[in-house]
Curated annotation (Swiss-Prot):
<comment type="function">
    <text>Multifunctional enzyme that converts the viral RNA genome into dsDNA in viral cytoplasmic capsids. This enzyme displays a DNA polymerase activity that can copy either DNA or RNA templates, and a ribonuclease H (RNase H) activity that cleaves the RNA strand of RNA-DNA heteroduplexes in a partially processive 3'- to 5'-endonucleasic mode. Neo-synthesized pregenomic RNA (pgRNA) are encapsidated together with the P protein, and reverse-transcribed inside the nucleocapsid.</text>
</comment>
<dbReference type="InterPro" id="IPR043128">
    <property type="entry name" value="Rev_trsase/Diguanyl_cyclase"/>
</dbReference>
<keyword id="KW-0378">Hydrolase</keyword>
<keyword id="KW-0511">Multifunctional enzyme</keyword>
<dbReference type="GO" id="GO:0004523">
    <property type="term" value="F:RNA-DNA hybrid ribonuclease activity"/>
</dbReference>
<dbReference type="InterPro" id="IPR051320">
    <property type="entry name" value="Viral_Replic_Matur_Polypro"/>
</dbReference>
<dbReference type="InterPro" id="IPR001462">
    <property type="entry name" value="DNApol_viral_C"/>
</dbReference>
<protein>
    <recommendedName>
        <fullName>Protein P</fullName>
        <ecNumber>2.7.7.7</ecNumber>
        <ecNumber>2.7.7.49</ecNumber>
        <ecNumber>3.1.26.4</ecNumber>
    </recommendedName>
</protein>
<dbReference type="Pfam" id="PF00078">
    <property type="entry name" value="RVT_1"/>
</dbReference>
<feature type="region of interest" description="Disordered">
    <location>
        <begin position="220"/>
        <end position="265"/>
    </location>
</feature>
<feature type="region of interest" description="Polymerase/reverse transcriptase domain (RT)">
    <location>
        <begin position="347"/>
        <end position="690"/>
    </location>
</feature>
<feature type="binding site">
    <location>
        <position position="551"/>
    </location>
    <ligand>
        <name>Mg(2+)</name>
    </ligand>
</feature>
<dbReference type="GO" id="GO:0003887">
    <property type="term" value="F:DNA-directed DNA polymerase activity"/>
</dbReference>
<keyword id="KW-0540">Nuclease</keyword>
<dbReference type="InterPro" id="IPR000201">
    <property type="entry name" value="DNApol_viral_N"/>
</dbReference>
<keyword id="KW-0239">DNA-directed DNA polymerase</keyword>
<keyword id="KW-0945">Host-virus interaction</keyword>
Amino acid sequence: MPLSYQHFRKLLLLDEEAGPLEEELPRLADEGLNRRVAEDLNLGNLNVSIPWTHKVGNFTGLYSSTVPCFNPNWQTPSFPDIHLQEDIVDRCQQFVGPLTVNENRRLKLIMPARFYPNVTKYLPLDKGIKPYYPEHVVNHYFQTRHYLHTLWKAGILYKRESTRSASFCGSPYSWEQDLQHGRLVFQTSKRHGDKSCCPQSPGILSRSSVGPCIQSQLRQSRLGPQPAQGQLAGRQQGGSGSIRARVHPSPWGTVGVEPSGSGPTHNCASSSSSCLHQSAVRKAAYSLVSTSKGYSSSGHAVELHHFPPNSSRSQSQGPVLSCWWLQFRNSEPCSEYCLCHIVNLIEDWGPCTEHGEHLIRTPRTPARVTGGVFLVDKNPHNTTESRLVVDFSQFSRANTRVSWPKFAVPNLQSLTNLLSSNLSWLSLDVSAAFYHLPLHPAAMPHLLVGSSGLSRYVARLSSNSRIINNQHRTMQNLHNSCSRNLYVSLMLLYKTYGRKLHLYSHPIILGFRKIPMGVGLSPFLLAQFTSAICSVVRRAFPHCLAFSYMDDVVLGAKSVQHLESLYAAVTHFLLSLGIHLNPHKTKRWGYSLNFMGYVIGSWGTLPQEHIVQKIKMCFRKLPVNRPIDWKVCQRIVGLLGFAAPFTQCGYPALMPLYACIQAKQAFTFSPTYKAFLRNQYLNLYPVARQRPGLCQVFADATPTGWGLAIGHQRMRGTFVSPLPIHTAELLAACFARSRSGAKLIGTDNSVVLSRKYTSFPWLLGCAANWILRGTSFVYVPSALNPADDPSRGRLGLYRPLLRLLYRPTTGRTSLYADSPSVPSHLPDRVHFASPLHVAWRPP
């Protein structure tokens, strides 16, 4: 007869009316009993012939993709002018005095952050925007381009202008100026000798400093005159209008420009498309503009050749239209859905490209991308705004993968010890936290995103048109991309983006200037940054608590008024460092703080309500007697594992599930096992904070017997049959807890000390977890353990009791600030349980 749930509870000693523990508990360590129970609950039967179930409620296999939903009305979030102050260390020192070694080290890591992967794989521009929404290809293309443009305007991206230069917006950092070692000198030569125009001091070539001579030429039509190659070569020796551009030997490569991406990437849908190339890769140093009076710099890539008057068409003859978008203007409409109807809507479509406020030199950057991008909802609760997902997973794959640095995350007990107190709490929201941290420009060539332009994107995705070779282009080929779908999409998008449609239809390559999400280095750097800032805040306000996990920053103070003044001071400090906070998202929690998925109050920690609801839902949908795919089990264990510390039996209860995942076998829930788990998770107990104290109770064991020292009392007992030493030590600890009720026990066994009972026989692990819940252990060396003699059967010998002080740990949660204890503002008779009374020591 299968084991009933009631019987199983009794077996695990979870009911009150269990027999004496010294008899019942050792039985649970018996292998035979564990095996019989596993068979009864159908836990051991891993090989099943029935087909597996691949979906339980919302849980599907780990690698099945949930199809994201496209929203044509997504808003692109705005990014305020985020600029982390470069002298952040000095500012912190003014605020709090000299920084500790740890704070210094962490802040240096991100000023600037560096990223040097072993191998970088470059992908063609077509892979720049992922075709994630096949139904909304054009819409997604423009929304993504607009998002990237917004990021570039906000100073978060560099725009690749040529192989060795990039432009950006926003305030420059010193390391962005250091790149130009030599002086960049523009020279235009006149007949009466050279006159150097705009000598540049080392540093950034800024828009304003380029001087009117160049700026005026930049303002002229981007589609400037196209020289005839033959004439140009013929005039090359002529001295009269010759121009020299002198650049000190430096990483600019050849002066002037190559047409971007001469390789197959760029057979874009345009003729020798000066302006198309120009947008993907701006000519070096604003094409090192050096032209004789009155001629626009064509920007068309020829090795810094200049065009004397008679060799090139003059401006009045009209520019040569080599821009895919503008070519439609002069063409005959091919149908009522021809794109020329849209292009003829307005006269001035604006420039083909935009350029940043500053130009810097970069290491060699190919006209390629290293990761694809696409848009998704900002979060499950906010579907009106979009979020850019960047896929740089190439750096985490294969044998060239980068091993990202590890960093400490506080475990549940450390977090509770630290934050469980009767403080008032408030949490701050750092807006676009990742985009605060600057990257060194040398990392730019490894983190490239972009797109190959609308013409090519549409050509690649529409079945009837082929990607046309630039050389043999006819007007008919131009119309290959016209279709009703494209026409309707563009008409709708015209209402949103207006003349920006033209700008966005050009190719572009952008590199990250701030750390992107989607690279394993970013979470590490963000954690280092926020923990250093919180450490500074804690030292500045020693009677308060500031703590962070990634971009989640919480502040605690003893009263609400105190908290508000702390909030004002900290906000002012963070803003002075250039950290942008989102005041609308500041949450005041009162005395129970919501943080990292937990609710933390003076009573301890529990999971947040939405997680509890998810668990209830999971059990409602969980099928019985049907094999469930192990990948789905991974999902279930992920959810249940989060709340396991709050249940009676903890992680050991999930061991059968872990075993099936390891064996990559399906798991079948028997009615009893499901009922057992369900009841475990319906009643959650808070995890309380550990208190410091003096250890009075000691336990020890040998394979054959156990001994306890409770105050001055000694006890001993023997096991029916010899047990493995770890099992014996665990039993002794359980006896000590049940006999004395003490929450602090001394033991010399490291496994018991670790409080991980998953490696013990299954039934014993479950029972011991419940008996020892909320117990703290202190390590006592065997030689000094007062329970050592009783465990060996010697009751007559008394070793003196040790004065063993127990200090709860806050783990490696970077509380490097030693905080002085604060006199309580409450009356003395009220015990103020706060981590603030305990001076923090570095771990």
